[in-house]
Amino acid sequence: MARLYYDADANLDLLSNKTVAIVGYGSQGHAHALNLRDSGVKVVVGLYPGSKSAESARLEGLTVTSVAEAAEVADLIMILLPDEVQKTVYQQEILPHLKPGKVIAFAHGFNIHFAQVVPPADVDVIMVAPKGPGHLVRRTYTQGEGVPCLFAVYQDASGQARDRAMAYAKGIGGTRAGILETTFREETETDLFGEQVVLCGGLTALIKSGFETLVAAGYQPELAYFECLHEVKLIVDLIVEGGLAKMRDSISNTAEYGDYTRGPRIITDETRREMEKILYEIQTGQFAREFVLENMSGKAGFTAMRRREAEHPIEEVGKDLRAMFSWLSKR
């Protein structure tokens, strides 16, 4: 069984008298920067000129500079930018300032694993990937807790890359919850697979198909929305808290029986074969090449898909229903 590492296993002193550059100040960026700062680490935030996030970072008392300036002064550079822009920013703003002994870090292995970013041989290359959104990484830290993280070493030029990755994970609160060692390849391929087959692609396709089936059969769209989308969170919360067993222990016998007898008719052997094809596309780099080329060509197809999905009837029904949820408007 995989081992989890905790506070006692990591040495935050490895970051003392060091400067950490956080490149990007979005969901993960703001959480990493603030948590490290509150852990006693010297932090500088690197942003492009005119970034709307600069003022937010300054209001938190953080030092904000250009990406190039941050990369120049930092000992450890954590890149927390969208996958599709990392290569350009790295080549133009970061690479010229990478000196022997520095550390370049990522929260996802995409650009390293698929060779979009190829660091020089004399720097450490590490990954620390919180398994939760940035607001949760920050909130749990302020509560004295943390979000579990994955960590990995791609290149160990200093002989301390692993310890440095664990120290960084401790600085953002990860070792409070537990951190799990992996590789860039394993994290990248499993993360993409989970997103495409289950969490995003699979789930949204299932929700829409269920909604469309009920509406086509003459049921009210509002009821279809409740049954196929709204209640997903209620079920997922139970699964997260105690696995599939707790969920099944919490639902009615009718629902549980339907789970066992009808679920396998939805996820069939044909579905599993398609899952295997998608995994193969990830492993061979086919998906990565497709995604990179889509962005290089201006994202016309991506933009069209976004527009089409935004116009799906479930979105309009959901918008009207959510406006009536008093408990939701208070969040």
UniProtKB/Swiss-Prot annotation:
Record InterPro entries: 6-PGluconate_DH-like_C_sf (IPR008927), KARI (IPR013023), KARI_C (IPR000506), KARI_N (IPR013116), KARI_prok (IPR014359), NAD(P)-bd_dom_sf (IPR036291)
Pathway given in the UniProt record: Amino-acid biosynthesis; L-isoleucine biosynthesis; L-isoleucine from 2-oxobutanoate: step 2/4; Amino-acid biosynthesis; L-valine biosynthesis; L-valine from pyruvate: step 2/4
GO cellular component, one term: cytosol
GO BP terms in the entry: isoleucine biosynthetic process; L-valine biosynthetic process
Domain KARI C-terminal knotted: 183-328
Catalytic activity: (2R)-2,3-dihydroxy-3-methylbutanoate + NADP(+) = (2S)-2-acetolactate + NADPH + H(+); (2R,3R)-2,3-dihydroxy-3-methylpentanoate + NADP(+) = (S)-2-ethyl-2-hydroxy-3-oxobutanoate + NADPH + H(+)
Domain KARI N-terminal Rossmann: 2-182
Pfam families, per database record: KARI_C, KARI_N
Active site: H108
Residues at which NADP(+) binds: Y25, G26, S27, Q28, S51, S53, D83, E84, V85, Q86, G134
Enzyme class: oxidoreductase
Key words of the record: Amino-acid biosynthesis, Branched-chain amino acid biosynthesis, Magnesium, Metal-binding, NADP, Oxidoreductase
EC number: 1.1.1.86
Protein residues bound to Mg(2+) 1: D191, E195
Binding sites annotated in the UniProt record for Mg(2+) 2: D191, E227, E231
GO terms for MF: ketol-acid reductoisomerase activity; magnesium ion binding; NADP binding
Cofactor note text: Binds 2 magnesium ions per subunit.
Positions annotated to bind substrate: S252
Cofactor: Mg(2+)
Chain's role: Involved in the biosynthesis of branched-chain amino acids (BCAA). Catalyzes an alkyl-migration followed by a ketol-acid reduction of (S)-2-acetolactate (S2AL) to yield (R)-2,3-dihydroxy-isovalerate. In the isomerase reaction, S2AL is rearranged via a Mg-dependent methyl migration to produce 3-hydroxy-3-methyl-2-ketobutyrate (HMKB). In the reductase reaction, this 2-ketoacid undergoes a metal-dependent reduction by NADPH to yield (R)-2,3-dihydroxy-isovalerate.
NCBIfam families: ilvC, PRK05479.1, PRK13403.1
Family listed: Belongs to the ketol-acid reductoisomerase family.
Protein name: Ketol-acid reductoisomerase (NADP(+))
Organism: Cyanothece sp. (strain PCC 7425 / ATCC 29141)
